[in-house]
């Protein structure tokens, strides 16, 4: 049995519908990355909102519910239970009300057919290929990157409900065939955080190039590519001898070989012939721990 979750209240501040789509997608891609199968999975919801007596809150509940419905229909994964926690707000000593943002926690539960085929997210060895599966867009509304910059703008990530289930099933197939050494879904802070976590968790370095990443939505900016939080994306480590089979597995879907693992304990990121990041894993891990704590 495998259990996975998805939640992002930052999205709920701006777009309750796409927040719901995003957290369902996050729960399912976490389930897939861990070795689960969405064909044998189910969903549970937990609605956490302010007072539904306020029209804007009730509207967000309706939009989030619609997002849950659309996602469940698209993925073919049913909701089997759920709960709500409403009226989450408080009043300060000046009489000002402070509601929580629209928040939806999605839990996915499924079955792992063969636990021996499960992989973890840490890199496994030097001289492997790194693949990014899924399409990147300039979707940064509610993102960790814009929060760091103090900006309240941008588009909350949506979900391509036609393509997303195909990507999930293709990744399941690749994992089931033993083509993947390590797998990490892309969520908060996007590719930048995912590749860093995979590298410093194992003490194995990586070199990636943002130039080759499938990108749609205007002029590519390296910071947007690196920190976009577009949904339905995976970063996978693959043995060179399995590269061809892995690529054929994703025929007709967006993917790119974006780099490789290296024996040096550092992360290098290039874009259009220029090195934009060259940092030791030790420093990345220290900064990550500082943020996590």
What does each model-found stretch correspond to?
Residues 1-138, 143-157:
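Glycine-rich phosphate/pyrophosphate-binding loop regions near the starts of catalytic domains
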Residues 19, 121, 168-171, 198:
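Detector for methionine-enriched segments
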Residues 19-23, 167, 191:
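Catalytic-loop motifs flanking and including active-site residues across diverse enzymes
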Residues 57, 64-71, 75, 80-105, ...:
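Glycine-/charge-enriched secondary-structure boundary and capping motifs
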Residues 132, 145-183:
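A glycine- and small/hydrophobic-rich beta-loop-beta segment
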């Amino acid at each position: 049995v495998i259990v996975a979750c998805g939640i992002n209240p930052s999205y709920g501040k701006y777009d309750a519908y796409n927040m719901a789509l995003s957290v369902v997608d996050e729960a399912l891609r976490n389930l897939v990355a861990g070795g689960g199968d969405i064909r044998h999975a189910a969903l549970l919801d937990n609605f956490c909102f302010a007072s539904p007596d306020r029209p804007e809150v009730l509207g967000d509940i309706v939009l989030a519910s619609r997002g849950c419905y659309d996602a469940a229909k698209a993925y073919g994964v049913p909701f089997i239970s759920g709960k709500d926690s409403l009226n989450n707000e408080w009043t300060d000593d000046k009489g000002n009300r402070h509601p929580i943002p629209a928040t939806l926690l999605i839990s996915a539960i499924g079955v792992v057919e063969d636990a021996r085929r499960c992989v973890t997210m840490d890199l496994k060895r030097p001289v492997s290929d790194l693949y990014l599966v899924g399409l990147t867009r300039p979707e940064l509304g509610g993102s960790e990157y814009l929060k760091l910059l103090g900006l309240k703008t941008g588009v909350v990530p949506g979900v391509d409900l036609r393509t997303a289930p195909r990507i999930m099933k293709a990744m399941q197939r690749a994992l089931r065939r033993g083509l993947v050494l390590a797998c990490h879904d892309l969520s908060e802070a996007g590719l930048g955080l995912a590749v860093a976590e995979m590298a410093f968790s194992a003490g194995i370095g990586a070199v990636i190039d943002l130039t080759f990443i499938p990108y749609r939505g205007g002029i590519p900016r390296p910071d947007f590519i690196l920190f976009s939080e577009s949904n339905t994306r995976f970063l996978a480590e693959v043995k060179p001898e399995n590269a061809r089979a892995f690529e054929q597995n994703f025929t007709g879907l967006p993917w790119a070989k974006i780099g490789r693992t290296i024996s040096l304990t550092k992360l290098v990121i290039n874009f259009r012939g220029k090195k934009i990041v060259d940092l030791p894993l030790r420093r990345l891990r220290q900064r990550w721990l500082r943020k996590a704590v």
